[in-house]
Amino acid sequence: MRLTRTRLCSLLVALYCLFSIYAAYHVFFGRRRRPLGTTSRNSRKAAAAQAKERRGREQSALESEEWNPWEGDEKNEQRHRVKTNLQILNKSTKEKIEHRVQIWGKAAIGLYLWEHIFEGTLDPADVTAQWREGQSVVGRTHYSFITGPAVVPGYFSIDVDNVVLVLNGREKAKIFHATQWLIYAQNLMKTQKLQHLAVVLLGNEHCENDWIMQFLKRNGGFVDLLFITYDSPWINGADILQWPLGVATYRQFPVVEASWTMLHDERPYICNFLGTAYENSSRQALMNILKQDGNDKLCWVSAREQWQPQETNESLKNYQDALLHSDLTLCPVGVNTECYRIYEACSFGSIPVVEDVMTAGHCGNTTSQHSAPLQLLKAMGAPFIFIKNWKELPAILEKEKTISLQEKIQRRKVLLHWYQHFKTELKWKFTKILESSFFINNKV
C-alpha cells in the first residue's frame, strides 16, 4: 500500500514537471514566434506598399502618355453600337426593298460601276475567277451583279425581270460580241423572261455608235435606257445619258482609300506624266515644253512611243507612285479628250491638268453642248485645271512653286471630297433613273 502511494506521488511529480516544462517552453519560445509572424506580415505590407508605389509610378507614366484604361471597353462598346446600328439599318432597308435589278458585267467598265461607284464587293475576290458576283442595296432597289468569262448567254439562270447590261462597243470585234448579247436579251424579252433592259456602253472614242440605235426603244427596239461614255451628241438627259469613263479596271487599277499621308505629306514632284507620246500629237508638244527651263526635272516624266494595253506589276506601281507623289497630273488628249488618267489622278488627290479641246470624230455637238468636251465632269463642278494649250503649262508650274503645303492640303481635300461626291451622286442618279423608267412609268 505504501509502495502504491509512493508510485502515485512519483507520477504526480512527473506530471507536474512535464507541465512546468511545457509552460516554460510556451512562455519563453511561444512569444518569440509572434514577432516572426508580425515581421512576416510587415514584410508583406511593405511589399504591397512597394508594389502599390510601383504601380502608381507605372500608372503615372501611362497617364503621361494619355493612356485610357477604359479604351478597350469603349472601343468594344463603340463597335457593338456600330454593329447594332448597321443591323437596324439593314433591317429597315430590307423592309423597304421594292425593286430588284441584276447587272450583267460584260465589259471592264462594269467593274468601275460596281466597285468604285456602288462601292460593292465581289466574291471571289480573285480577278481571274470565271464567275464573280456581289449584292448591294441603293434606296428601294436591290442590285445583284455578275461578271466573268463564265457569264455566257444561255448558260446561267435568270431569276430577275429587270437587267442592266454592261457592254464594250469600242471596236468592231467588241461590237460583234455586244450584239450577240443584245440579241440574247431580245429573245428573253420575247419569251417574257425579261421586262426591262438598260445598257451601259463603253462607246467608241470617236462617238461612232450607230450600230446600237436599232436596239433602242425609241427606234422600235427594246432597250429602255442607254448610258454611254464620251460626249455623244445623242445625250438628251431622258433615255440617253452620259456615263463616266472611270479608271482603267482592265489594267487592275484598284479602289484607292484616302490616307493621312496622301492628304498631308509634302509631294516631291510638282507634276507627272507617264504615258504614250504619239508622233505629231499634243502629247509630243507637251514633252517639248516640259524640257524647257528644266521643268522635266520638277516632274515625274516617263514617255513611251507605243501604247501598251496591259501593265506589268512594276509599271502599275510606278504609275500609282507617280500619282501619289505629284501635286498635279498632266492629262493631254489622246484619241478622245476624256481619259482614264483623269479619274485615276482624282483617286490619289493629284489635281488633273486637263487639255480642254475637242478631238476628231462625232463627239460633242458644240451648238447644243456648249460645255463639251467633258460636259459631265464640268456639270458636276470638277475642281480641275483646264487649259486650251500646253503653252500655258510653264506659268502653272511657276505658280505651283509659290503655293504653301497647307494650301495644297486643302486643295487635295477638296478634290477627294468632290470625287467621292461625284461617285455617290452618280449612284443615286443611276438608281433614280432606273426606278423611274423600269417601275414608276410602267405601272398600269
Swiss-Prot record:
It is found in: Golgi apparatus membrane. It catalyses: 3-O-[Rib-ol-P-Rib-ol-P-3-beta-D-GalNAc-(1->3)-beta-D-GlcNAc-(1->4)-(O-6-P-alpha-D-Man)]-Thr-[protein] + UDP-alpha-D-xylose = 3-O-[beta-D-Xyl-(1->4)-Rib-ol-P-Rib-ol-P-3-beta-D-GalNAc-(1->3)-beta-D-GlcNAc-(1->4)-(O-6-P-alpha-D-Man)]-Thr-[protein] + UDP + H(+). InterPro entries: RXYLT1-like (IPR055286). Forms a complex composed of FKTN/fukutin, FKRP and RXYLT1/TMEM5. Keywords: Golgi apparatus, Membrane, Signal-anchor, Transferase, Transmembrane, Transmembrane helix. Residues 38-79 are annotated as: Disordered. Its EC number is 2.4.2.61. GO terms for molecular function: ribitol beta-1,4-xylosyltransferase activity. The gene is Rxylt1. Residues 1-9 are cytoplasmic. Residues 51-60 have a biased composition (Basic and acidic residues). This is Ribitol-5-phosphate xylosyltransferase 1. It comes from Mus musculus. It comes from the Eukaryota. The chain crosses the membrane at residues 10-30. Belongs to the RXYLT1 family. GO terms for cellular component: Golgi apparatus; Golgi membrane; nucleoplasm. One of its GO terms (biological process) is protein O-linked mannosylation. Residues 31-444 are extracellular. It is a single-pass type II membrane protein. The keyword Membrane applies. Coiled coil: none annotated. Acts as a UDP-D-xylose:ribitol-5-phosphate beta1,4-xylosyltransferase, which catalyzes the transfer of UDP-D-xylose to ribitol 5-phosphate (Rbo5P) to form the Xylbeta1-4Rbo5P linkage on O-mannosyl glycan. Participates in the biosynthesis of the phosphorylated O-mannosyl trisaccharide (N-acetylgalactosamine-beta-3-N-acetylglucosamine-beta-4-(phosphate-6-)mannose), a carbohydrate structure present in alpha-dystroglycan (DAG1), which is required for binding laminin G-like domain-containing extracellular proteins with high affinity. Pathway: Protein modification; protein glycosylation.
